[in-house]
Structures are given as structure tokens and as C-alpha cells.
């Protein structure tokens, strides 16, 4: 077992430079009070790692450094040397030291110290020679170490500064007086259950981590579940949308196919119907012909009857009968003619109006052309005059030219003929070129249309391509998961921090309350003793220093009934001096120092801040203190600082009730105060007194430090809350952004589907159009090639003729005078130009004249003729209407008269007349049948016309339906459609198909907009959901594993602890028996010892078993020492340090304890500080400590 061999104290407390050898066994240190004997124990604790200067009986670590002769040393250093023969410390040295050094600036350093043997060569001079000898010496080595490394090293050799083997002054009674739980923890340390605690803590951390993972997984699962539920409906809609679209495509294709078939069938039927109607019409015409034959036969018979009547009756009857029939026929014809005349009149009026409109438009065109022609004729006349002048000049020039008449004439004749040929050819070429230009224009237009369609197709294709790089929603959903976890955990941490803030705020409020109370107590004492304060204030105000305003109380006023309450609420702060700036306050403070006027408090307006009072409306509340005071608004912060969250109430009873409800300061009208903490201030208001009292500022200082510390903690917590709030806001914003991006992605997907569908349809239509244009271009190109070839041939012919003419002209030029020829040439050129311009104008005039003469004037004539004809017709029809109306009236009257007369004359010729009438009736019936047949024939013509109109409509519809069929997706191109669906759709009629199409289109419209990514996203999210559930099960298994591990560790911890407890309890009973009494240890909770404490019962000699609480100080010390020795016997420490543990023992018990230490020192080192002879006499070595010149000195005595 390792032991301390030596202690070196250098500049440590009262020791300047002291080395203290510590042998095995029992070492006693004694000396008078204040000699510094306990400083040796402090040195040991210092090296063993005490972290608090106060535990070493110093304010700060640098106060451990020796202070002597008015000067403090540069550092303090203590080294504990250990016997390392067994190499328990892993350094190859028999003696190893642990050193701790503290400097004036408070820096602490640790070192490991050992000694190495080095040989040194020395020379010895003699008279005859020099000899070399070697001498071994020990050299100190040290290596700096970290504190944790030192503590780990000490722990390995069972040396701990806070262990039960080091008992300082007062520790013995603290062991007894401490709580049972703290006492049990001593056994925890002895039994080594900390190892299990570490394992348990590690397992708990792992368990916590597993649970945190589960919590995170649950958040992810909830987020994924929410997305899954949202996507489920969208997926179903997308699937429906896909199915509906497929059905719609099939329905459209089959419906359009059936419509095409139906229209073709209808056209065939109409063709057959027209043929049948024409055959029927032919039958009617044949029937009419037959009726005409019958009518002729009947008329012959009637003539015979008439002849017979003539023979038998008077001619007058016959004439009268004939006249009646003619009148009846004429009357019927006039009625029919009247109806027709009225219809014709209406039609004529419409035609007349239309022709008049055309006539006005045509006249306007003629007028415009005539105006234009007059302008051009004027221009042409000017050109003609100029040409005449030029021709006259040319003739004069030609007369002057002498030339060979015969040759020049012949050449000119040839040139003239060639010119005519050239003119004819040019005209023909001009016409062909015009035709070619028109053809090229048409070709260019169609080519332009073709290219424009291609550009449109390219644009439409590009529009589709723009949607190829849509945002990956899988990444967005994954990021939403991460954000959800971060957001939920941030909210959880925020709640924890808010709870911590509230707790800290509550503690702070309590501390503030205590501080205010203590400060008020101190202020009262100061007010009682320090009457110079008013003098200081008065001195500053009288000095009228720059920036000094006044005391706060003078800057406000209140009503008389509130005076006491406001004075108490403001307290001494009302006497604080208000200054404009901090510099003004500094100036006033310096003034007080210079004049020695005392002290005063200053409130700088540029820095002072206060607390806003909360709004409280309840029984007894008069108002906020600050609201019951009148002051200039610029002093608002000053009075916020003075009054804070203070409210004035009517009486103490209401104040008490209000303080239970609200966290505020309440002051009654009589001056009682209830602080937010619940503290109450009241009673009789006392005046200043001259009695002086000592003022202990320690509590106030401690409260102030605690407040600062808690305020810092609260500030940190608030910062963390703010950070978490910012993080939550950031996460929430990010989540909204991701949700928005998801929505945009869904909308873009739907837009892509819509645009793709629409654009593909347009592209297909444009391709169909381009196919037709391509055919047109091909035809136009062929025509262009033919025309181009004709133009080329004419160009070649023209070039040849012009070449011949040029040769002749050159030959003529050779006979001509050069100067005259040049002028003639210029004249000819000018004439040609003018002729050309004149011809152009004449052509345009001719065109206009032709247009007027051949088109517009004939059209006007035609229109006038038509209008005149229509006017004549109109008049004729009007006259006809009047005539027919007059005839009908006249003939109706005549017919009535003749019928009366006829009836009188025909009484005797009834049979013949009846027979004749019968024939006439039969003729009339035949005529009616004939008319009916004519009408039927006319109806057939009308029906044929109607059918032809309908046929034209059907042909247009067929063309449209064929176009639609071309644009439809064929059944082969529609994916995933069943034969059953096709057969079922084919089985429906057109009406059913149209209804189905309307229903499908309506269903699709209701579903829109559709998230077409939902199917893919749903599958992805569903897989993620399953994956997360799998992970959760894994973490649940981990959780179970750690729970089981914690349970096993706790079980082993309890078993280990109980073994230690049983042995310590046994040792305790044995040791207490050795000192003449009975003792017993027991656990508060034997089932779960760690949830309870350790109880110690003892019965000193000749006393009953009793509780610690009723024992004397000596009995408690004896019991504590028995407890410590019981532990020592169980697990002896390498050494023990006891500082005046026998102080409360009587002589007998001190001797007994001395014997126990002496016996125990056979196994462990004991260093004991004591004044008792009974203790010291049992030691092996004794050190005496005394104080000389402010430094401790040590004298050793071996006993």
C-alpha cells in the first residue's frame, strides 16, 4: 500500500519553506491555537485537489501565498511525496511527488516530481598526480500535468480530497448532523457504487438518446403521416384523373370514329334519298301527264253535254254556266295570284334595298377612279408635249445628218422590226414575270406560313421542355421531416427554458424582495445614523452645478390624500438628485468629495431606466403610483425607476388579496407595503434618530452577488429563449417556404400536364396543316419551274434579238455624225423615259377606264337596270295587288248574281247539268290532284334543296370530325387500356358516348387542379413511413435493452451496497462495543436503500440506545468516529488525516479513540492534529508547531 513519505510546504500560508517527513503509523501534530498546525492539513488538501479557496480557509487562492514582513511571496507550492517502491505510480522512481503551485495572479499548476541519480566526475589534486573520482547525486525532475490527470492518478491510489479519510475541523459533527441521505452517500462512496452509477448514467444517457431518437422518429412519423394523409386524397384524385383521361381518350376516339362513320352513312343515305325523291318526282310528273290526258277526255265529254244542252236548252243557260265557271276559276286564280303578288312585293323590296346599297358603293369607287384618272391624264399631257418637242428636235437633227439613205433606211427598217419584236417579247416576258412574281409571292407566303408553323411548333415544344426540370418533391418532403424534428425539439427546449426562466424569475423576485427588505433595513439604519445625507443634497442643489435639475420629489406633485402612499412608494429615491447626464453626476460627486459634504444618489436622465407598471383593475386599486403623480413627460424614465411596478391601494386587506393574484408591489394610503415576493412593510413611520448602530453589509452584498449571478443566468436563459424563438420562427418560415414550394411543384406538375396536352394537340394540328401546305408548296414549285423555264427561254430569245438590234444600231451609228448622234441618242433616251412614264400612266388610266367601263359602269347599268326592273316589278306587284283585290271584289259580286240567275234557268235541265257538273267536278278534282302533284313535285325540289343544304352541313361536319379524329390519340397509343373497356365503349351509342364524354370532362374538371406527382410522392412517402416504423422498432428494442441493463446495474449496485452496508454495520456494532457501548446502523428503506438514508443509533456506556438528535457533542463525536473506523476496517485508506476530532471527547473516550487510531495505524498512515495528551501519547511521531515572527516552525519528537 502506498503511503505519504514527506510534505514540502513552500510559501504556503504561515510556512516559509518547511519539509515534514511522515513515517508509517500514527503521526501527531500539536501546537497552540494560531500556530499554523492546521495549515499542514490544508497543504495536503491543496495538493489533493480542493477546488474552493474557502474550503482551505482563504478568500482566494492567491491568499494561500505566505504574507510576511508586509510583502506576499511570488507563489506558494506544496508537494506530497509518496513511497513508490512498489511502483503503484507509473514512474520509475522510489519516491514520487505530486506538486501544486499557485501564483499571485491565481493561476494553478500541477506537477509530478521525482528524482533521478546522475554521476558527476571530479578531480582531486595531489602533489604527485591528479585522480578522477565519480560521485552520484540526485537531480529533481518535474513534469507539468493537467488537473484531471493528477486527480485520476490520485484516485487510482485511493487518495481523494473530499473522501471520508480526511476529517477537518467541524467535519465530524457534520457527518452526524447531516441528513440520512448524505450519510448514506458516504457508504455509496466506500462501496464503490459510483462505478455502477457511471454505468447506469451511461445506460441512462444511451436510453435517453434512444428515447430521443424515438421522439425524433415519432415527429418524423407524424410529419410523414400528415403528408401521407394529404397525399392519399391527391393520389386517389391523380389516379382517377389518369383513368378518366384514358377513358376520355378512348371515348373521344370511338365517338369521333362513330360520328365519321355515321356522317358517311348519312351522306350516303342523303344521296340515296335524293335519288329516291327524284324518282318520286318523275312519277309525279308522269301522273300529272296522265291527269292532263284525263282532263282532256272529260272536257270532250263536257263539250258533248254542252252540245246536247244547246240542243235541249237555251244558249243563254250554257253561256251563263260557262260564265259562272270562268268566274269561279278566275276568282280562285286571282286569290292565288294576290298571295303570290304580296310575297313577290316583299322580296322585291328587300332586293331593291340591297341593290341600292351596291349602287352607292360602286358609284363611290367610280368617283375615286375618275379623280385619280384626271390627275394621271394631266401628268400624261405634260409628258406628251415634252415628247412632241423632243421629236421635233430630233427631226431637225436628222435633217442635218447626211447619210447613205438606202443603207440607213434598210438598217432602220430592220432595227424597227427588231424593236417591234423586242417590244412584243418584252410584253410577253413582262406578263410571264408578273405571273411568276405572283406565283413566287404565293409560294413565299405558303413557305412563310410553313416556317411560322414550324417556329410555333418549336416554341410549343420548348414550352413543354421548360417543365422538364421541376423541383424534386422527395427532397422537399425529406427536408420537411428535418424541419419538423428541429421545430418540435426547439419548442420542447423552449418550454423547458421558459419554465427555467419562470423559476429563475421567481427566485430573482424573491431575492429582489429580500434585497429590498435588507436594503430598507440598512437604509433605515443609515437614515437613523447619517443625518449628513440631507446636507449633501442641499450642498449640491445650493451649488447650482451645471446639469443638476433638482431632487426627484421636487419635480412632481400629487394630491394630499396620496401623499403618504407616494412618499412610501418612492422612499429615499424621492430624495435622489436628478441630473441631465452622467457627466453631470460625476461632476456633482467630485464636488461632494472636495467639499466633504457627504454622499448623494444621482439619477442621470440620459441613462436611467425603470420598470413599466402592469395594468391591474381590481377591487381596492386606486391606480399605478406613477399615474398618481404629475410631472413633466421628460422625467418619465426617472419616475419609472422610482416607482416601478408599484400600485396604490385603499387598505391593507385589499392589498393582501391583490398580492395573492398579481406579481406587483402594493402600497396602501397609510403607507403599508406588500412586495411581489409577499414581504410586507408597515407599522408606525419613525423619524430620524441620533443613535448609531453597526451596519452589517455582508447579507446585502451576498444578496447583490446572488442577484447578479441569477440575473446573468436569467439573461442567458432569455438569450436562449430568444435564440430558440428565432430558431422556431426560422424553422416555421422555412416550413412555410417548403410547403409553398411543394404547392408550386404540384401546380407546376399540373400545369405541365395541361400545357403538354394542349401543346401536343396544337403541334399535331400544325403538322397536319404543314402537310397540306407542303403539298401546296410542291405544286407551286412545279408551276414555278415551268414558268421559270418559259421566262428563261424568252430571256434567251430577247437577248438574241437585242443582240441583232444592237449590231444594226452600231452599224447605223457608224453612218451618223457623232455629236448629232449623241444628242439624238440623248433625245431618244429621254423620249423613251417619257414614253415609258406616259405608257405607265396610260396603262393605269386604261386599267381604271376598263375597270369603270367594263366592270363598274356595266355593274351600275346592271344595278340601275335591276333597280328599275325591281321598281317596275314593285309597281307592277303593287298594281297587281290592287287589281287582284279589285277583281276579287268585282268577280265575287258578279258570280253571286249569275249563280242566282243560273239556278232559275237550269231548273229544267238538271240531269244534263248535274252530269256536266259531275264532269266538271271531276275535272276540278283532277285539277286539284294535278296541283297537289305539282306541289308535291315542288316539295320534292324543296326537300332536295334542304337535303343538299343538310348534306353540305354534314360534309362540313364530316371534314371537322375527320380532323378531330386525326388529332385524337389512337387506341394503340393509349397506354394500359383493356380490351373490355374498348369493347364496352364500342357497344355504346353516340348519344351515350356524348353523355359519357360530358360526364368524364365534368369529372376531370372537378378534379382539377390535380397533383400528378402525388402517386409517385405517395409511394415514396409510404416507403419512408414503413422505413421509419422499422427504425422505431429498432430503437424500441434498444430502449428495452437499456432498461434491462439499468435494471441489472441497479440490482448489482444494491447487492454491492448491501454487502458493504452489512459489513460496516457489523464493524460499527463491534467498534462501539469496544468503547463500552452499543451501536446500530439501519436503513430508512431496506427495499430501496438509495431512496432513503442511513440512520445511526448508539447507546454510550451505561445509557439506553438513543437517536443522534438527543446526544451530547462528545457522544456525537464518539459515534461519528466509530462510524469512520467501521468504514476504515472494511476498506482501509492509505492514510487518514484527522483535525482535532477529539476536541469534544472526555478524557476516557479520547484515550479510547487514541487506542483505536494506534491499532488502525498498523494498516494505514494517520496524521492527527490534537491538543489532547491522551491522543498525542498514543502516536509514533509527534510534531510541535509554533509561531515565530509571523511564520510557523516545526519541531519533531519521536516517541
UniProtKB/Swiss-Prot annotation:
- Report the NCBIfam families cross-referenced here: SMC_prok_A
The superkingdom listed in its UniProt entry is: Archaea
Query: PANTHER family of this UniProt entry?
Result: STRUCTURAL MAINTENANCE OF CHROMOSOMES PROTEIN 3
Q: Please give the InterPro entries that the UniProt record associates with this protein.
A: P-loop_NTPase (IPR027417), RecF/RecN/SMC_N (IPR003395), SMC (IPR024704), SMC_hinge (IPR010935), SMC_hinge_sf (IPR036277), SMC_prok (IPR011890)
Its GO CC terms are: chromosome; cytoplasm
- UniProt comment concerning the protein's domains: Contains large globular domains required for ATP hydrolysis at each terminus and a third globular domain forming a flexible SMC hinge near the middle of the molecule. These domains are separated by coiled-coil structures.
From what organism does this protein derive? Methanococcus voltae
Consequence of gene disruption: Mutants show a high rate of anucleate cell production and a subset of cells that is extremely enlarged with irregular morphology.
Q: What function is annotated for this protein? A: Required for chromosome condensation and partitioning.
First-listed, main subcellular location of the protein, grouped into a coarse class: cytoplasm
The protein in question is named Chromosome partition protein Smc
Specify the SMC hinge domain's residue ranges: 546-658
**Keywords for this protein:** ATP-binding, Coiled coil, Cytoplasm, DNA-binding, Nucleotide-binding
Q: Where in the cell is it found?
A: Cytoplasm
- Gene Ontology molecular-function annotations: ATP binding; ATP hydrolysis activity; DNA binding
Amino acid at each position: 500500500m502506498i503511503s505519504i513519505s514527506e510534505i514540502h510546504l513552500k510559501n504556503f500560508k504561515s510556512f516559509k519553506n518547511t519539509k515534514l517527513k511522515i513515517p508509517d503509523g500514527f503521526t501527531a501534530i500539536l501546537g497552540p491555537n494560531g500556530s499554523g498546525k492546521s495549515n499542514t492539513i490544508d497543504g495536503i488538501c491543496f495538493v489533493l485537489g480542493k477546488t474552493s479557496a474557502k474550503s482551505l480557509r482563504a478568500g482566494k487562492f492567491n491568499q494561500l501565498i505566505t504574507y510576511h514582513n508586509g510583502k506576499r511571496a511570488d507563489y506558494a507550492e506544496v508537494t506530497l511525496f509518496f513511497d513508490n517502491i512498489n511502483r503503484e505510480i507509473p514512474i520509475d522512481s522510489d519516491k514520487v511527488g505530486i506538486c501544486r503551485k499557485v501564483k499571485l495572479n491565481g493561476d494553478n499548476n500541477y506537477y509530478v516530481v521525482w528524482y533521478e541519480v546522475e554521476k558527476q566526475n571530479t578531480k582531486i589534486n595531489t602533489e604527485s598526480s591528479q585522480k578522477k573520482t565519480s560521485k552520484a547525486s540526485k537531480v529533481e525532475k518535474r513534469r507539468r500535468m493537467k488537473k484531471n490527470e493528477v486527480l485520476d492518478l490520485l484516485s487510482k491510489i485511493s487518495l481523494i480530497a473530499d473522501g471520508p479519510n480526511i476529517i477537518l475541523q467541524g467535519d465530524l459533527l457534520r457527518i452526524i448532523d447531516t441528513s440520512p441521505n448524505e450519510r448514506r452517500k458516504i457508504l455509496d462512496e466506500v462501496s464503490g457504487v459510483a462505478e455502477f452509477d457511471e454505468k447506469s448514467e451511461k445506460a441512462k444517457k444511451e436510453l435517453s438518446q434512444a428515447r430521443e431518437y424515438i421522439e425524433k422518429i415519432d415527429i418524423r412519423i407524424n410529419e410523414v403521416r400528415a403528408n401521407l394523409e394529404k397525399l392519399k386524397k391527391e393520389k386517389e384524385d391523380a389516379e382517377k384523373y389518369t383513368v378518366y383521361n384514358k377513358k376520355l381518350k378512348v371515348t373521344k376516339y370511338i365517338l369521333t370514329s362513330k360520328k365519321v362513320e355515321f356522317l358517311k352513312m348519312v351522306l350516303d343515305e342523303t344521296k340515296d334519298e335524293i335519288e329516291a325523291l327524284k324518282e318520286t318526282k318523275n312519277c309525279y310528273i308522269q301522273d300529272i301527264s296522265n291527269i292532263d290526258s284525263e282532263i282532256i277526255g272529260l272536257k270532250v265529254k263536257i263539250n258533248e253535254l254542252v252540245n246536247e244542252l244547246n240542243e235541249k236548252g237555251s244558249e243563254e243557260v250554257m253561256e251563263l254556266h260557262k260564265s259562272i265557271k270562268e268566274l269561279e276559276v278566275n276568282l280562285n286564280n286571282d286569290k292565288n295570284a294576290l298571295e303570290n303578288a304580296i310575297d313577290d312585293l316583299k322580296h322585291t323590296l328587300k332586293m331593291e334595298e340591297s341593290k341600292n346599297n351596291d349602287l352607292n358603293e360602286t358609284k363611290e369607287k367610280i368617283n375615286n377612279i375618275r379623280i385619280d384618272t384626271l390627275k394621271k391624264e394631266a401628268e400624261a399631257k405634260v409628258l406628251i408635249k415634252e415628247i412632241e418637242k423632243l421629236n421635233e428636235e430630233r427631226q431637225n437633227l436628222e435633217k442635218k445628218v447626211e447619210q447613205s439613205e438606202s443603207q440607213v433606211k434598210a438598217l432602220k427598217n430592220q432595227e424597227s422590226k427588231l424593236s417591234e419584236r423586242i417590244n412584243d417579247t418584252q410584253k410577253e416576258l413582262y406578263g410571264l414575270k408578273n405571273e411568276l412574281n405572283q406565283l413566287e409571292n404565293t409560294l413565299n407566303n405558303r413557305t412563310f406560313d410553313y416556317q411560322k408553323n414550324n417556329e410555333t411548333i418549336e416554341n410549343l415544344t420548348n414550352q413543354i421542355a421548360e417543365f422538364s426540370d421541376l423541383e424534386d418533391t422527395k427532397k422537399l418532403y425529406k427536408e420537411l421531416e428535418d424541419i419538423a424534428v428541429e421545430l418540435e425539439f426547439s419548442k420542447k427546449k423552449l418550454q423547458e427554458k421558459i419554465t427555467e426562466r419562470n423559476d429563475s424569475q421567481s427566485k430573482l423576485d424573491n431575492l429582489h424582495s429580500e434585497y429590498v427588505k435588507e436594503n430598507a433595513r440598512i437604509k433605515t439604519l443609515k437614515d437613523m445614523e447619517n443625518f449628513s445625507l440631507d446636507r449633501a443634497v442641499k450642498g449640491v442643489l445650493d451649488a447650482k452645478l451645471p446639469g443638476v435639475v433638482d431632487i426627484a420629489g421636487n419635480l412632481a406633485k400629487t394630491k394630499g390624500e396620496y401623499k403618504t402612499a407616494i412618499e412610501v412608494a418612492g422612499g429615499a429615491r424621492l430624495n435622489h438628485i436628478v441630473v441631465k447626464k452622467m457627466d453631470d453626476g460625476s461632476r456633482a460627486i467630485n464636488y461632494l468629495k472636495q467639499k466633504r459634504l457627504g454622499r448623494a444618489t444621482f439619477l442621470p436622465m440620459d441613462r436611467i431606466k425603470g420598470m413599466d407598471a402592469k395594468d391591474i383593475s381590481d377591487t381596492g386599486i386606486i391606480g399605478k403610483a406613477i399615474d398618481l403623480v404629475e410631472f413633466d413627460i421628460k422625467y418619465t424614465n426617472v419616475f419609472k425607476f422610482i416607482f416601478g411596478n408599484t400600485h396604490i391601494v385603499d387598505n391593507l386587506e385589499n392589498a393582501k388579496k391583490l398580492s395573492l393574484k398579481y406579481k406587483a408591489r402594493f402600497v396602501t394610503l397609510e403607507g403599508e407595503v406588500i412586495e411581489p415576493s409577499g414581504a410586507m412593510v408597515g407599522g408606525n413611520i419613525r423619524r430620524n434618530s441620533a443613535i448609531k448602530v453597526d451596519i452589517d453589509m455582508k447579507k446585502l452584498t451576498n444578496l447583490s452577488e446572488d442577484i447578479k449571478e441569477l440575473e446573468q443566468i436569467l439573461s442567458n436563459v432569455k438569450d436562449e429563449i430568444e435564440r430558440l424563438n428565432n430558431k422556431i420562427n426560422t424553422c416555421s418560415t422555412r416550413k412555410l417556404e417548403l410547403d409553398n414550394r411543394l404547392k408550386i411543384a404540384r401546380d407546376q406538375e399540373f400545369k405541365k400536364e395541361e400545357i403538354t396536352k394542349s401543346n401536343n394537340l396544337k403541334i399535331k394540328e400544325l403538322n397536319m396543316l404543314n402537310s397540306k401546305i407542303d403539298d401546296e408548296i410542291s405544286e407551286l414549285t412545279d408551276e414555278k419551274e415551268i414558268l421559270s423555264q418559259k421566262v428563261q427561254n424568252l430571256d434567251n430569245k430577247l437577248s438574241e434579238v437585242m443582240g441583232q438590234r444592237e449590231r444594226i444600231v452600231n452599224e447605223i451609228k457608224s453612218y451618223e455624225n457623232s455629236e448629232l448622234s449623241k444628242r439624238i441618242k440623248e433625245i431618244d433616251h429621254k423620249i423613251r423615259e417619257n414614253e415609258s412614264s406616259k405608257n405607265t400612266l396610260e396603262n393605269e388610266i386604261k386599267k381604271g377606264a376598263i375597270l369603270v367601263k367594263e366592270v363598274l359602269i356595266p355593274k351600275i347599268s346592271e344595278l340601275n337596270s335591276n333597280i328599275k326592273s325591281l321598281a317596275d316589278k314593285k309597281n307592277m306587284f303593287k298594281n297587281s295587288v290592287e287589281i287582284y283585290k279589285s277583281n276579287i271584289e268585282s268577280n265575287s259580286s258578279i258570280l253571286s248574281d249569275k249563280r242566282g240567275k243560273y239556278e232559275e234557268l237550269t231548273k229544267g235541265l238538271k240531269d244534263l247539268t248535274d252530269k256536266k257538273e259531275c264532269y266538271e267536278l271531276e275535272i276540278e278534282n283532277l285539277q286539284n290532284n294535278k296541283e297537289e302533284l305539282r306541289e308535291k313535285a315542288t316539295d320534292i325540289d324543296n326537300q332536295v334543296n334542304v337535303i343538299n343544304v343538310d348534306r353540305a352541313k354534314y360534309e362540313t361536319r364530316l371534314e371537322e370530325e375527320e380532323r378531330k379524329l386525326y388529332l385524337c390519340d389512337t387506341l394503340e397509343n393509349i397506354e394500359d387500356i383493356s380490351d373490355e373497356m374498348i369493347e364496352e365503349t364500342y357497344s355504346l351509342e353516340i348519344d351515350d358516348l356524348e353523355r359519357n364524354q360530358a360526364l368524364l370532362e365534368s369529372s376531370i374538371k372537378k378534379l382539377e387542379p390535380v397533383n400528378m406527382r402525388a402517386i409517385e410522392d405517395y409511394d415514396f412517402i409510404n416507403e419512408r413511413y414503413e422505413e421509419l416504423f422499422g427504425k422505431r422498432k429498432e430503437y424500441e428494442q434498444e430502449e428495452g435493452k437499456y432498461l434491462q441493463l439499468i435494471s441489472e446495474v441497479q440490482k448489482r449496485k444494491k447487492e454491492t451496497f448491501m454487502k458493504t452496508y452489512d459489513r460496516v454495520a457489523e464493524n460499527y456494532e463491534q467498534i462501539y462495543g469496544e468503547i463500552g457501548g452499543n451501536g446500530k446502523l439501519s436503513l430508512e428503506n431496506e427495499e430501496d436503500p438509495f431512496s432513503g438514508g442511513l440512520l445511526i443509533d448508539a447507546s454510550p456506556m451505561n445509557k439506553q440506545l438513543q437517536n443522534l438528535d438527543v446526544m451530547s457533542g462528545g457522544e456525537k463525536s464518539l459515534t461519528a468516529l466509530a462510524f469512520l473506523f467501521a468504514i476504515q476496517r472494511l476498506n482501509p485508506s492509505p492514510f487518514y488525516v484527522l483535525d482535532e476530532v477529539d476536541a469534544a471527547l472526555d478524557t476516557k473516550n479520547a484515550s479510547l479513540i487514541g487506542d483505536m487510531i494506534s491499532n488502525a495505524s498498523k494498516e494505514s498512515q494517520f496524521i492527527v492534529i490534537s491538543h489532547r495528551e491522551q491522543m498525542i501519547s498514543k502516536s509514533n511521531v509527534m510534531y510541535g508547531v509554533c509561531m515565530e515572527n509571523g511564520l510557523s516552525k516545526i519541531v519533531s519528537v519521536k516517541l
